[in-house]
UniProtKB/Swiss-Prot annotation:
Cofactor(s) listed in the protein's UniProt record: [2Fe-2S] cluster
Domain of life: Bacteria
Protein name: Ferredoxin
Keywords of this entry: 2Fe-2S, Electron transport, Iron, Iron-sulfur, Metal-binding, Transport
Lineage: Bacteria, Bacillati, Cyanobacteriota, Cyanophyceae, Nostocales
């Protein structure tokens, strides 16, 4: 579950 959270965070930062 932490992986999805991390990917979401990166995607949000990348824009």
């Amino acid at each position: 579950m932490a992986t999805i959270y991390k990917v979401t965070l990166i995607n949000e930062t990348e824009g």
